[in-house]
């Protein structure tokens, strides 16, 4: 098929009923990009022979090298369907535009799936039939369920059942049935959870005496069933695929049955009676051993083709098969020794996978007209947003009205090298424009000279013996132009195109000055002016042009060098050798976007109740249609389409909402990214002078990757947070080669830890036996404050961790200082009443928690760290006030104690890491009498303190730390959940690698119908670097781990433990030969942070050196 003209795409964009926005999602290596290649080949974008090999949408070199997708790529496909009309020989032609997004499958890049899913209306879910449902398969199915995307299922790599597992057609049919059951069971679990939440919500409404009717949801249409034509059986690498409807049409004439009837019986327990030639079910078998129709009519024919081509080549049988299927084979095809190519030729003509997928997409997945009505409640963040938005905008979004107000959602910002953008036609400037440019160039030259203090001297200087009266020329030039103040000229001018970010790979020459003017048509055609050459835009007939001709030794050279050094940063910002442009990846929900249109940009924190905050204005400079790596320029783009937008750089960081100016908008940026940036490194330039380029590069990387988090530590270090080892490697490569363009050095990956304590049997005696364990009395000025600490149970800690977003929403806490690990976790929002009810239920599950946290609603004074963490601050007798009840604090310095609590849980006593699972109770605040003060013997006590409130903050922190250490302290390390699928041959090697890295096996089971074992293990993140490569080496590539961050886990060892009993001393000695893992990690963290470490520098001084005796 020849390539489709861009005008065809533009025409189809105007009809949302013929548009399908879909994304391809799956586990890593399940065949997404190979399937995309086949779909691209159907549009003539690539050759059919290269489909599955070229990986067209993997445009990055490292994607091609590793063979995995790292970034989402979009492309538009054209598909035409011919349907028969009753009473007419002319077929009914319907054209469709399919906007396809190929997303990554690796867990490190799952944020790309989240960004793609919000833009789409449907999803193509691929499952490798040999590996079955894997960890990422469940993740992408959950993403589809959350975003209300309608999915279709593609059972890919069926050829592996023939060539690798060597199953019979009947065994393959049973295996395929089980895979479909696995997928449906996952979807069923989502439905059951949602139904349970609906039931809980209904009961809460009844308790409020609201007449709420319970609506029972039907689950009949949510499952995959081949008879419903929402399942495709395929082998993308071999280029074939089909759904039941296609083969029902194929066998319609051969069997003399109606297509609708055949479609109902081609899948399932239906058989053909060989005597009566009738289709029967299980009841009609009567003990006979018959094969299902799917096996006898479909799978056996496919198996026969593979056996006669791949297993043992039989040319006569191949010709017979081609004739039966009405397939045209050339003589060169039959003579070819490439069996795979012959197989692709036959199967591609009989059952092309592109036709099967695109036909199913058109028939089963909704258009924007249909989906936006159903998904609008999911897209909108809350009901209050809906009530506050303009009714015209709401109606336009529901109907996908291209004439209504504009609304669009930007899911992420793409960074594209400027040279890869489409070249725009440049208009030839008129003579008047050339003269104006020449005048401006002279004006800039005079300003630069004036700044150098050389204007007066130049009138007296003869630059060239052969030139004419240069001093007169300079005087005339000075008189004919307006020279603004030098201070205004040295300020960097903002670019008209907000989307151009410059990256300097080498320092600019001191003479290569360049200026930009408002009168230019495009930023590419900037006028360059250098004092050592004639600018190209100066009219050669201008009598003043000779003043720009200089000899090789320029008398102004030294002065201009001084100017360049003074304004080096400004120069770097204005001119560079490499440029990156930010293009927004967006979906238009209503209205029509036009180039040059002024639009309102709403940030993710925008609230319709405060319409003046988190809102900016931008101008759309360019619109693009995505065609893989290529971009097609557009002038307008109506609703229902996926489009690229330039002009939003600096306005949209990672995601945002575009609303027509003057219209009350709504926040569409409520997408929940299921990722956690857990791996952190400190980056710095190899050359300290290039720090500004690193900062600029980090900002651009932060915008271009939705999973990256960058910030500056208190120490001044620039920190880069990524999702995993592979993601970190890609980010550092992009930062070096694209965004910063400089050589970068980075620290060893730093993993976040947590600190906690527990009650253990071998704890040391309490510090104060009279007060009890975990109690500390703070004596400060005239106050005696008693603090009590105790550990929270695991269920309470998990609840607080899962509902941090709800707590933050209720307390309206700013997220600017939140830990990125905290920000990315959390479930859906709960209101205040629901949160307290759910929290009380969790507390009542355990007797100890119920005893310690009784009456928490009145006592609760705060959470921490960042006021939303997994630690609780309580107070007796309203000393600190009540957080939820709103009662005032009885103690005048309550804020100081609250701030001290936040400091204490933000940096624990072990290694200055955040504390988790601690409850602090302020039992009493006693104002001491003079006699009590005089009886105090503590030498650290101070009675007269000038700034008591400030001193109380640090003293509270120290007191809580003292009470913390009275228990058995523990270091918590970050844990990966590791899923590995491997064969029995290398099972022992996988176990060895995991155990060697302090991991533990959680479960192991053999996947039914396959020779593979499914292993689930927990591996510490700090020990997981190089794990994937190590396992691949040990197993010769037979096993590939998938690592997902799953929280923090205690190292079950006291970091301060030393041998004390006779048995321990006898076994381990005074120096404890057994390594204390907890102490090792605690010391490593303290060493990295520059904290004191209690360790012996020299153990045995006499053994350091052996002197020879003469």
From Swiss-Prot:
Record-level GO cellular component terms: cytoplasm; cytosol; ribonucleoprotein complex
Location of Phosphoserine modifications: 431
Binding-site list for GTP: 26-33, 102-106, 156-159
Keyword annotations from UniProtKB, A to Z: Cytoplasm, GTP-binding, Hydrolase, Nucleotide-binding, Phosphoprotein, Ribosome biogenesis
Molecular functions per Gene Ontology: GTP binding; GTPase activity; ribosome binding
EC category: hydrolase
InterPro entries per the UniProt record, alphabetical: EFG_II, EFG_III/V, EFG_V-like, EFL1, EFTu-like_2, P-loop_NTPase, Ribosomal_Su5_D2-typ_SF, Ribsml_uS5_D2-typ_fold_subgr
GO BP, sorted A to Z: cytosolic ribosome assembly
Signal peptide positions on this chain: none
Residue span, tr-type G domain: 17-262
Keyword Transferase among UniProt keywords: no
Enzyme Commission code: 3.6.5.-
Biological role stated in the UniProt entry: GTPase involved in the biogenesis of the 60S ribosomal subunit and translational activation of ribosomes. Together with SDO1, may trigger the GTP-dependent release of TIF6 from 60S pre-ribosomes in the cytoplasm, thereby activating ribosomes for translation competence by allowing 80S ribosome assembly and facilitating TIF6 recycling to the nucleus, where it is required for 60S rRNA processing and nuclear export. Inhibits GTPase activity of ribosome-bound EF-2.
Family: Belongs to the TRAFAC class translation factor GTPase superfamily. Classic translation factor GTPase family.
Note: Present with 7770 molecules/cell in log phase SD medium.
Name used for this protein in its record: Ribosome assembly protein 1
Protein species of origin: Saccharomyces cerevisiae (strain ATCC 204508 / S288c) (Baker's yeast)
Gene it is expressed from: RIA1
């Amino acid at each position: 098929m020849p390539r489709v003209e861009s005008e065809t795409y533009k025409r189809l964009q105007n009809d949302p009923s013929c548009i399908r926005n879909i994304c391809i999602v799956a586990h890593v290596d399940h065949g997404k990009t190979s399937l995309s290649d086949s779909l691209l080949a159907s549009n003539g974008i690539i050759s059919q022979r290269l489909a599955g090999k070229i990986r067209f949408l993997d445009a990055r070199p490292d994607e091609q090298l590793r063979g995995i997708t790292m970034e989402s790529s979009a492309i538009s496909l054209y598909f035409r369907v011919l349907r028969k009309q009753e009473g007419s020989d002319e077929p009914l032609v319907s054209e469709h535009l399919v906007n396809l997004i190929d997303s990554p499958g690796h867990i490190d890049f799952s944020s790309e799936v989240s960004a793609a899913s919000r833009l789409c209306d449907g999803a193509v879910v691929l499952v490798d039939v040999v590996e079955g449902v894997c960890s990422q398969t469940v993740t992408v199915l959950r993403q589809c369920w959350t975003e209300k995307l309608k999915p279709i299922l593609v059972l890919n790599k069926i050829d592996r059942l023939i060539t690798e597992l060597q199953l019979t057609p009947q065994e393959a049919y049973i295996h395929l049935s089980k895979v479909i059951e696995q997928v449906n069971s996952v979807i069923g679990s989502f439905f059951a959870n949602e139904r349970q939440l609906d039931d809980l919500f209904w009961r809460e409404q009844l308790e409020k005496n609201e007449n709420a009717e319970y609506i029972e949801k039907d689950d009949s249409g949510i499952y995959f069933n081949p008879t419903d034509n929402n399942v495709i059986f395929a082998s993308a690498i071999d280029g074939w695929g089909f759904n039941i409807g296609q083969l029902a049409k194929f066998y319609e004439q051969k069997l003399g049955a109606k297509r609708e009837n055949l479609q109902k019986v081609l899948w399932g327990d239906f058989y053909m009676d060989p005597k009566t030639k009738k289709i029967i079910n299980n009841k009609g078998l009567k003990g006979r051993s018959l094969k299902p129709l799917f096996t006898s009519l479909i799978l056996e024919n496919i198996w026969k083709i593979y056996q006669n081509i791949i297993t043992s080549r039989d040319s006569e049988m191949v010709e017979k098969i081609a004739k039966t299927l009405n397939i045209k084979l050339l003589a060169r095809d039959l003579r070819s020794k490439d069996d795979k190519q012959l197989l692709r030729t036959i199967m591609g003509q009989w059952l092309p996978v592109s036709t099967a997928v695109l036909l199913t997409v058109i028939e089963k997945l909704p258009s924007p007209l249909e989906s936006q009505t159903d998904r609008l409640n999911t897209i909108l963040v809350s009901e209050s947003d809906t009530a506050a938005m303009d009714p015209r905008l709401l109606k336009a979004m529901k109907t996908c009205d291209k004439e209504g107000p504009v609304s669009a959602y930007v899911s992420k910002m793409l960074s594209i090298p400027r040279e890869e953008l489409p070249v725009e036609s440049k208009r030839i400037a008129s003579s008047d424009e050339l003269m104006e440019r020449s005048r401006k160039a002279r004006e800039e030259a005079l300003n630069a000279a004036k700044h150098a203090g050389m204007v007066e001297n130049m009138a007296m200087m003869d630059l060239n013996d052969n030139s004419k009266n240069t001093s007169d020329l300079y005087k005339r030039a000075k008189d004919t132009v307006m020279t603004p103040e030098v201070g205004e000229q040295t300020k960097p001018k903002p670019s008209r195109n907000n989307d151009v970010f410059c990256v300097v790979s080498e320092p600019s020459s001191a003479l290569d000055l360049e200026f930009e003017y408002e009168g230019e048509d495009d930023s590419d055609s900037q006028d360059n002016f250098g004092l050592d050459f004639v600018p190209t835009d100066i009219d050669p007939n201008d009598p003043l042009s000779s003043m720009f001709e200089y000899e090789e030794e320029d008398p102004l050279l030294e002065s201009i060098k001084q100017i360049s050094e003074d304004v080096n940063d400004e120069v770097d910002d204005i001119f560079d050798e490499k440029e990156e442009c930010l293009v927004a990846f967006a979906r238009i929900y209503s209205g029509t976007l036009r180039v040059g249109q002024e639009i309102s940009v709403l940030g993710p924190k925008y609230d319709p109740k405060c319409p003046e905050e988190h809102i900016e204005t931008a101008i759309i400079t360019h619109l693009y249609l995505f065609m893989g790596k290529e971009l097609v320029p557009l002038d307008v783009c109506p609703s229902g389409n996926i489009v690229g937008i330039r002009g939003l750089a600096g306005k949209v960081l990672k995601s945002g909402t575009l609303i027509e100016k003057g219209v009350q908008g709504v926040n569409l940026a409520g997408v929940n990214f299921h990722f956690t940036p857990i791996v952190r490194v400190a980056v710095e330039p190899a050359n300290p002078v290039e720090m500004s380029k690193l900062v600029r590069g980090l900002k651009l990387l932060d915008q271009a990757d939705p999973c990256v988090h960058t910030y500056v530590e208190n120490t001044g270090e620039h920190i880069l947070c990524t999702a995993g080892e592979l993601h970190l490697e890609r980010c550092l490569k992009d930062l070096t080669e694209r965004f910063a363009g400089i050589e970068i050095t980075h620290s060893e990956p730093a993993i976040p830890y947590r600190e906690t304590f527990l009650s253990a049997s071998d704890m040391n005696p309490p510090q104060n036996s009279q007060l009890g364990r975990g109690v500390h009395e703070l004596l400060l000025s005239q106050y005696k404050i008693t603090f009590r600490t105790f550990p929270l149970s695991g269920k309470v800690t998990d609840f607080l961790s899962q509902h941090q977003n709800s707590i933050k929403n209720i307390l309206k806490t700013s997220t600017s200082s939140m830990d990125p690990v905290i920000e990315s976790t959390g479930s859906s929002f709960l209101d205040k009443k629901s949160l307290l009810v759910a929290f009380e239920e969790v507390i009542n599950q355990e007797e100890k928690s119920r005893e310690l946290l009784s009456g928490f609603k009145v006592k609760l004074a705060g959470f921490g760290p960042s006021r939303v963490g997994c630690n609780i601050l309580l107070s007796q007798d309203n000393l600190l006030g009540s957080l939820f009840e709103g009662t005032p604090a009885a103690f005048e310095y309550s804020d100081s104690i609250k701030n001290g609590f936040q400091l204490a849980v933000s940096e624990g006593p072990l290694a200055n890491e955040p504390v988790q699972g601690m409850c602090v109770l302020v039992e009493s605040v006693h104002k001491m009498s003079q006699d009590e003060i005089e009886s105090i013997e503590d030498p650290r006590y101070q009675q007269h303190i000038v700034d008591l409130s400030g001193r109380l903050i640090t003293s509270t922190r120290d007191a809580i730390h003292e009470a913390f250490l009275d228990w058995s302290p523990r270091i918590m390390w970050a844990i990966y959940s590791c899923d590995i699928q491997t064969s029995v041959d290398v099972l022992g090697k996988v176990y060895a690698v995991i155990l060697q890295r302090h991991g533990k096996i959680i479960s192991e089971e053999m996947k039914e119908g396959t020779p593979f074992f499914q292993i689930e293990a927990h591996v510490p993140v700090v020990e997981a670097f190089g794990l994937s490569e190590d396992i691949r080496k040990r197993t010769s590539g037979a096993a590939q781990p998938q690592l997902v961050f799953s929280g923090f886990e205690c190292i079950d060892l006291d970091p301060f433990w030393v041998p004390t009993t006779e048995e321990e001393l006898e076994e381990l000695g005074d120096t404890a030969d057994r390594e204390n893992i907890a102490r090792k990690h605690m010391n490593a963290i303290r060493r990295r942070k520059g904290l004191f470490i209690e360790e012996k520098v020299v153990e045995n001084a006499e053994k350091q050196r052996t002197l020879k005796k003469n």
